[in-house]
Amino acid sequence: MLSPKRTKFRKQQRGRMRGVATRGNKIAFGQFALQAQDCGWVTSRQIEASRRAMTRYVKRGGQIWIRIFPDKPVTMRPAETRMGSGKGNPEFWVAVVKPGRILFEMGGDEITEAIAKEAMRLAQYKLPVKTKFISLDEDLNKGNYKPAKTPVTADDSESSS
């Protein structure tokens, strides 16, 4: 399962999940993606279960990219422990997910939209956040990806005047 090799501090505060994802909210590697619709913590076990569900469905067909990483330690106290005596020990790792964040991407020559949709649906069941399936074509149509500006040539400037 995923976890950081080393961290600066062993324990973190729980924090708040406000707003939407400003980074990691566009498709970067594949043609299809699973995008979070609400906020939550996704544990390393849930990420691994989703990954296994997708890879088993697509077999050797395409490639899967995991776009989230569990870098936040969650501490827990032993059961039936009295209050006080410090913070508990780190038990598991979570990835903080905000709305709009891309969780998984999928692509490849043999991956059709139907195959990707079904594989992502199987992965959705393993996750604690509400998600939706998006494709690169939809994102291009929405205007999320702006093409690089083309330089104006001398021929273009003469014809416009």
Swiss-Prot record:
Self-association state and partner proteins as the record states: Part of the 50S ribosomal subunit.
GO biological process: translation
GO cellular component, one term: ribonucleoprotein complex
Region named Disordered: 140-161
Molecular function in Gene Ontology: rRNA binding; structural constituent of ribosome; tRNA binding
Keywords: Ribonucleoprotein, Ribosomal protein, RNA-binding, rRNA-binding, tRNA-binding
Family to which the UniProt record says this protein belongs: Belongs to the universal ribosomal protein uL16 family.
Gene3D superfamilies: Ribosomal protein L10e/L16 (3.90.1170.10)
Function: Binds 23S rRNA and is also seen to make contacts with the A and possibly P site tRNAs.
Protein name listed in UniProt: Large ribosomal subunit protein uL16
Family matches, as Pfam families: Ribosomal_L16
